[in-house]
Amino acid sequence: MKRALISVSDKTNLVDFAKGLVQNGYEIISTGGTKKTLDEAGVKTISVEEVTNFPEILDGRVKTLNPYIHGGLLAKRDDLEHMATLEKLNIKPIDLVCVNLYPFKQTIEKPDVTTEEAIENIDIGGPSLLRAASKNYQDVTVVTDKNDYDLVLKEIAEKGNTTLETRAKLAAKVFRATAAYDAVIANYLTKQVGLEDPEKLTLTYDLKEKMRYGENSHQKAWLYEDAIPKSFSILQAHQLHGKKLSYNNIKDADEALRCIREFQDEPTVVAMKHMNPCGIGRGDTLEEAWDRAYEADSVSIFGGVIALNRKVDLATAKKMHKIFLEIIIAPGFDDDALEVLEKKKNIRLLKLDFSKENEPTRPEIVSVMGGILQQEQDTLVENTDDWKVVTNAQPTEAQLKTMMFALKAVKHTKSNAIVVANDERTLGVGAGQPNRIDSAKIAIKHAGDAIDDRAVLSSDAFFPFNDCVEYAAKHGIKAIVQPGGSIRDKDSIEIADKYGVAMVFTGYRHFRH
């Protein structure tokens, strides 16, 4: 008679699986809560203690760590010495292992979890069983995912055993699962001891979906989610309407969320296009904020991704409905607003809980050939009290407020980045140019006649020469905010003084590549 060892924390479909094994001639070894569940369901089992002749000890910390278990798993059936050893020691082979692990991840997601509670949910015996069975997949079937129960039972019923191909795939799946399990534990404990730069970086993500394609149609792509999901994330958004999100949709929507998170005090609308804001507007109402974001660049917003920081009302929905948009993401939608927007078949409407927008961020990871770069996200909150006025002209309180608005916008624009804005909206965005003066020219050209005494210019990095300041001044800019720090800062200050421009140094650069 073949033997199966079953010990699971997730008991979904457990009884049916065990009954299927029994019907196909398996004897079930089990322990703890799993044994109790099976016994109550009328499935005959034998306890681990009956196999090992050794009781559970240390409050259940040691149950299956025993040669009578691991010998039965690791013995190679075609190795005469191995089998002779089993016979000599009266160890019976175990042909199938079904184990899933203590819920460590679910435990540490609890808001009030203690370190002691987390540690008690680190599984030791489970991973040992899974790894032993997987190592010997030539002879042993190993199952850790309830979604594989039917496949295993089907093959056993039809062929008397699982196929070698299936056993190999299940073994590989187990090693992925145990590696991910250990990674979550390692990351939790590393965080507990406050280590920022561990010598080994362990990352684990769960497959959320296979994408139709990647950035371009000839590229394959997959979407993976952090093993410990973040609440304020495009991956946690609830899609109310429209087609599935594409690879590019997700990237643009993610950038839109990063940007809208900067604006919390007033109704604000961010229009994102190819990872750059083409328009940001704010107002007393969401409709007013939309009008200003649209006015910022009524051409580029076509086909854009829109993030709003207030619930979408009917008036705003009617205006958004007039143009083609890829995505609208907001904290919610009034029923009548949703009804209007749903008339467009392909628009993607996403609802996300904005109450978690201030939760701590996780490091950004960028792939490079042969490795990765990791850095903290740029979540620096600027404070006007820390800024330094470097010109004779002093900025007004209104200009300082507008500078802050423009700085938040330029922070989410690809470098070299220049943003021209007034106190209500962006007027022009110059993004991604190899030199700063070209970005300035693009932003000022887009702003055009909208430049007035309220307009300010923000730069994500210092001006290497005075040309940007002079160009801006000649086109009506009265105030500039930039990090400072160039060896030629003096030249830029002199030009600003020549034209009576107020200029502020923040001391912080905001490159974005």
Swiss-Prot record:
EC no. given is 2.1.2.3, 3.5.4.10
Q: Which organism is it from?
A: Lactobacillus acidophilus (strain ATCC 700396 / NCK56 / N2 / NCFM)
GO terms of molecular function: IMP cyclohydrolase activity; phosphoribosylaminoimidazolecarboxamide formyltransferase activity
Q: What is this protein called?
A: Bifunctional purine biosynthesis protein PurH
One of its GO biological process terms is: 'de novo' IMP biosynthetic process
GO CC annotations, alphabetized: cytosol
**Could you tell me which residue ranges the MGS-like domain spans?**
1-144
Question: Which family is it part of?
Answer: Belongs to the PurH family.
Gene3D superfamilies named in the record? 3.40.140.20, Methylglyoxal synthase-like domain
